[in-house]
Each structure stands twice: as C-alpha cells, then as structure tokens.
Amino acid sequence: MNKVLVLMGGTSEEREVSLKSGKAVYEGLKDAGYEVEALDFTPETIHRIREYSPDVVFITLHGKNGEDGTVQGYLELLGIPYTGSGVLASAVCMNKVITKKLLSYEGLPTADFQVIKKRGFNRDLFNPDLLMEDFGLPLVVKPATQGSSVGTSIVRKRKNIVPALELALSLDEEILVEKFIAGTELTVTVLGKDNLKTLPVIEIVPKNEYYDYESKYMPGMSDHLIPARISEEERERVEEISCKAYDAVGCRGYGRIDLILDRGGNPYILEINTLPGMTGTSLVPDAARAAGIKFPELLDLFVKMALEK
C-alpha cells in the first residue's frame, strides 16, 4: 500500500480554500484505500515532509509558495514524487503575465492585454484614458500571481480604473489589464502528459457578475452545467485549444483550463490552473463525476500518474 502525504494550508491568501481541498482529498484517498497523512504546510513544518517518508505527496496548496513551483522544487530535491505539474509549468502558470506572453507566442487565443508594474506607477500621473483607448470599457484588472480571483476587478466606469489598479498592485508587483470579453465561461480539465485526455466541458454560470472568489467556493453561488450549452464544433475547438495550452506550458498529470467563448463562438484562454481546487464546489471533481469517475477513483488516478513520472 502506498503512503500518501497531503499538503494543505500554506501561507497564501488562498489558505482556507487549500484547507478545504486538503480535507476532501484526505478523506477521498482513505476511501480509495491509501495510507494517508496530512500536513498543514508552513515554513515551520516543511522539514516534517521527510519525517513522514511518503511514497507520494498530494499537493492541495493554492497560490504563492505552493502552486508556483517552490514546493515542487523542494520535493524534487528530496526525490519524492508529487501530484500535478513540475517546477517550470507551475511557475509559468502562476504568473499570468508570463502565461499570456507564452500563449500569444504559440498563437493561442487570449484577450488583448497590457502589463503595469508597481515600480513607477503613480496614481496622480496615471491617465486612465490610455487604457480606455486600448481596451474600452468594461476592462479587467488582475494581479499577476494571485489565484481564486483574489484582487480581480471588472471595471465599468472610468473613475474606478485607478482604484482597481491600486487594489491589484497592493497584492502584486505587476498586474494585467485585459480587454473584457463577453460570452460563456467554460472550463476544461486535461489529464495526462503525452496522450492527453479531457473531461467533459463545463459551463460556469456564476450568480455574481463573474466567477469570483465567492462564486468559486460558496455553495449555491454558481451553477456548473454539464454538458455545456455549446455546439459540438465549439466543444471540439475548446478541447483542442485547451490541450494545446496545457502542452505549451508543459503541464503534466492534470490541470484545468479556463476559457471564455465569445458571442461569435470564438474561444479565448483566460487561465491555466496547475493545482485546481478539490473542494465540494470545485470544477474538476464535477467534471469527473460527469464522466462516471468517482472522487476516490479520480484521486487514485492522480497518485498513479505521479508515480509514473
């Protein structure tokens, strides 16, 4: 029997979400027949990973110092297999600026964007009209390295542009400003390393203005429609683009690609999640259920893929 250590918690703004994911994974792995331990991961407890002598580490950390390649690199040094993508893909996908640049280079569709850095930003000298000329209104403001929509704003009025920039810059050294694309929010779970497979496409219908933190983690705040209300041609295109994006950044094991399908049926990649949530309201478990895969079976698959790396 393989021994699995579940890493949860962490020190990022997404700590509470990580704890929920970790607890769900802990129980699911026990149901799958594994010997399971759990560790609330902090700088003070990192040394205990070796003490557990796990065969596999199941990472349910979200955000900085967990999803960004740092923990993955530490586990590589220890020689312990772990779930999800490796160091490079984790680091790339944690940074939305680098991800956007890479996707654009690969010719994959993503919304027009501009990068603003904290260094040199002066609210008194900044001219919001320049962003409005490039993107119009509404526009989207995101911190580069936050997850779960933390610090993200959809700005519909000129007077709210600078406050949205300041909010995002309070959380990060650089931020993204994107053209807002109206349409259908979709997400695709991709599995594997070489022979990629996808789980059913999910359409996300948030109760709030967009798929924000509350919509993601509060029960009843979003509907996950499976199958998505899109044509077969659109579904195939979305799956194809998702697999190309997953492969372009070097993901392995599993990941979730978030997209928007505009009103003309054109898909745009929003984000690539290398450690998507595993809570009771999370999308990946929902997609697996729609494919006939129970939660313990899904976790068992992730562990086996980690051991095959």
Curated annotation (Swiss-Prot):
Positions of the ATP-grasp domain: 100-304
Pathway(s) where this gene product acts: Cell wall biogenesis; peptidoglycan biosynthesis
E.C. code: 6.3.2.4
Sequence positions that bind ATP: 132-187
Location, primary (coarse class): cytoplasm
GO biological processes: cell wall organization; peptidoglycan biosynthetic process; regulation of cell shape
Single GO MF descriptor: metal ion binding
Entry binding sites for Mg(2+) 1: 258, 271
Pfam families: Dala_Dala_lig_C, Dala_Dala_lig_N
Matches recorded under InterPro entries: ATP-grasp (IPR011761), ATP_grasp_subdomain_1 (IPR013815), D-Ala_lig_Van_CS (IPR000291), D_ala_D_ala (IPR005905), Dala_Dala_lig_C (IPR011095), Dala_Dala_lig_N (IPR011127), PreATP-grasp_dom_sf (IPR016185)
Cofactor annotation: Mg(2+); Mn(2+)
GO cellular component, as recorded: cytoplasm
UniProt cofactor note: Binds 2 magnesium or manganese ions per subunit.
Alphabetized SUPFAM superfamilies for the sequence: Glutathione synthetase ATP-binding domain-like (SSF56059), PreATP-grasp domain (SSF52440)
Task performed by this protein: Cell wall formation.
Family: Belongs to the D-alanine--D-alanine ligase family.
Full protein name: D-alanine--D-alanine ligase
Gene field: ddl
